[in-house]
């Protein structure tokens, strides 16, 4: 516990209609080699009796603070900012409710990245679960390889948009730098993590991909969901064009598709190749429409987006 005495970590987790993965996550938090000083559950309130019972259950857990969030008040950046503002530790760990630590060393391995003062953020490797299929497994390996990596402004030419990649599925931040950057942007449909990473890198800090810090996390999206998710991605790139306009993300997307295609061909998975082409088409269309959202009528934007409530006040 000597290391824990030297540097403390607070954990912030937005919660909405949690399932078994969340309970596994909380159990794993209690088993970490370095335990978090505090866990702040930013709980978007449901209207069911079951949800109320779960809230009461976690209110009783030592070290856990449950912060009620009204559904209409939830914001990807703002809600996380609210949690970070409550934190007193020098490091804060942001997680989603469906990210389950693989072992007891997640927090320890992330903390280790901050031995160097210039490191402002570190994010974990995401492992695909069995049920998501071969395409998602390969995508996870592509985006989260076995080799750790330090990323600085000098890597923009080589890595392109991947320089700014960071995921709040499981990412630790140096709170002093986070505050210096003004926290997460509050007006964004999502992608607050990459926007923060971009600001940190542009300010001269380092973002680390820590391959030895691992969480189980993956999704199995259908064509419609792929379209909507990538529509929202395109929206965020359009809204923050000062960050993303000079760096193409489409080149990286093409590289992923081609490498996945080769992998599936070698595995003789013709069925998966057909699925890959289908999904990639929806991704591409969604992203292209999202980048041009400001030219679309609001009713069409609502249909295309996965974040319906984001558009309640118009195009913004």
Predicted regions and their residues:
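Short, well-formed alpha-helical segments that are part of the catalytic scaffolds
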Residues: 18-31
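Conserved donor NDP-sugar-binding/catalytic core segment of glycosyltransferases
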Residues: 100, 104-137
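Glycine-rich, basic loop-to-helix element that forms the pyrophosphate-binding segment
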Residues: 70-87
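Short beta-strand/loop segment that forms part of the nucleotide-sugar
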Residues: 26, 37-47, 67-69
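Non-catalytic, C-terminal membrane-associated alpha-helical segments of glycosyltransferases
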Residues: 232, 246-316
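A recurrent flexible, glycine/aromatic-enriched loop bordering the glycosyltransferase active site
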Residues: 153-173, 189
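Short aromatic/hydrophobic "clamp" motif used to bind/position activated sugar donors
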Residues: 92
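Acidic donor-binding loop at a coil-to-helix junction in glycosyltransferase catalytic cores
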Residues: 190-196
């Amino acid at each position: 516990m000597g290391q824990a005495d030297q540097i403390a970590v607070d954990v912030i987790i937005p919660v909405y209609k949690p399932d078994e993965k969340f309970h596994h996550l909380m159990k794993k938090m209690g088993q970490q080699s370095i335990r978090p000083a505090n866990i702040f559950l930013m709980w978007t309130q449901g209207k069911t009796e079951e949800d109320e019972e779960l809230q009461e259950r976690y209110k009783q857990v030592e070290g856990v603070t449950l912060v009620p969030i009204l559904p209409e008040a939830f914001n990807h950046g703002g809600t996380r900012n609210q949690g970070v503002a409550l934190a007193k530790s020098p490091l804060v760990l942001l997680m989603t409710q469906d990210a389950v630590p693989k072992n007891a060393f997640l927090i320890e391995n992330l903390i280790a990245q901050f031995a160097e003062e210039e490191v402002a953020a570190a994010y974990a490797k995401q492992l695909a679960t069995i049920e998501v299929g071969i395409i998602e497994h390969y995508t996870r390996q592509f985006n989260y390889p076995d080799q750790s990596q330090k990323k600085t402004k000098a890597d923009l030419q080589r890595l392109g948009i991947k320089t700014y990649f960071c995921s709040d599925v499981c990412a630790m931040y140096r709170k002093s730098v986070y505050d210096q950057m003004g926290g997460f942007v509050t007006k964004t449909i999502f992608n607050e993590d990459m926007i923060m990473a971009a600001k940190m890198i542009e300010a001269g800090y380092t973002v680390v991909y820590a391959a030895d810090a691992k969480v189980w996390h993956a999704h199995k999206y259908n064509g419609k969901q792929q379209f909507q998710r990538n529509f929202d991605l395109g929206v965020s790139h359009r809204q923050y064009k000062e960050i993303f306009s000079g760096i193409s993300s489409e080149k990286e997307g093409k590289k992923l598709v081609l490498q996945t295609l080769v992998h599936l061909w070698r595995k003789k998975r013709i069925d998966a190749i057909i699925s890959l082409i289908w999904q990639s088409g929806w991704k591409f269309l969604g992203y292209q429409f999202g980048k041009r959202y400001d030219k679309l009528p609001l009713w069409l934007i609502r249909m295309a987006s996965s974040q319906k409530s984001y558009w309640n006040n118009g195009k913004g």
